[in-house]
Amino acid sequence: MLQLCPLDEDTLYTHVYERYVELDRHAETLAQDLGIHASDAETLVVDIAPAQPTKSSDTYSLTVSQSLASLRSSTVNNNSTTGYVLWSGTPFFLCWLLYAPSAAPLRDGGRVPVTDSAAQFLQLPPLFSAPARPVCVVELGSGAAGVAAIVLANYVDRYLVSDQKAILKPLRANLLANISEVSRRTVCSKQTPELSSNRRTPARCELELIALDWERIATVPAALRPTDAAHVHVLALDVVYNDFLIPPLLTAIKRLLRWYADEHAVKATAYVLVHLRAQDILQTFLEHAIIDLRLRCYYMDEERLRSSRFALYYVTL
């Protein structure tokens, strides 16, 4: 069962300690590496499927190109190179989101129990669109693989995939190579029309690539507007790995949430998936979010998440 654990300036430290105790408990069953999905291949097949697929299961198979040479370079993209490879957090999150019964409140919206709070439940807004509830997803720091964009474009009306300008060329190539995997919706793209498809379905997804370096946001790009979305979800998967990047990432998230609320009268929330590496990185992330920026941060507690090397947080204003 999924539970939300609200964190504050006191409980965050207990949470970090307990989460790493849990991580140690599962150490023998978890990969002891940096988290690159495939560290020995430039081209890889990424399958998003349940553990036991059936004929009715939605499954996806993507062929992704990555650059291990760029990852290891000290000169490429001003030494900002992690986006050139696929990290394991994205496939893990997608498989959990799509197939775990406990993730249904994220997919479709629903009440989730809240621990240690006067409020017994919190209503999560649906991450997946429905005819009466158009949804927009803004992915920050997507990386060149574009796996989340292709898979989630099947379920939302608008998907805005963003990263640094240098990442957009390989990202565009991977999206084009896998656009056929968006099978549940017709894709339309104003800025990259070659991504557009013609499916026999009235459901549509606007898929746009946007250059956005969250270390240097002078103004929020107009391309991030919500159009007619009832809700905007900001998605950040496995981008918390360096203490230097934590303040600009969280500042960008807060700025976007506030921009949607104040400039567009649209509620926005965020999901941040953290790969658990150094304990002090997670603590710094939570301290900056909760203490410095006064964001509301909930740890998403669920059996499969708990037994993984990842921690998922729900963040609101």
Swiss-Prot record:
Entry annotated with the keyword Transferase: yes
Signal peptide: none
GO molecular function: protein methyltransferase activity; S-adenosylmethionine-dependent methyltransferase activity
Keywords, sorted A to Z: Methyltransferase, S-adenosyl-L-methionine, Transferase
Gene Ontology, cellular component aspect: cytosol; protein-containing complex
Binding residues annotated for S-adenosyl-L-methionine, in chain numbering: 87, 141-143, 163, 214, 237
Domain of life of the organism encoding this protein: Eukaryota
EC number: 2.1.1.-
Keyword Plastid: no
GO biological-process terms attached to the record: methylation
Family: Belongs to the class I-like SAM-binding methyltransferase superfamily. RKM5 family.
Physiological role: S-adenosyl-L-methionine-dependent protein-lysine N-methyltransferase that methylates 60S ribosomal protein L1.
Name assigned to this protein: Ribosomal lysine N-methyltransferase 5
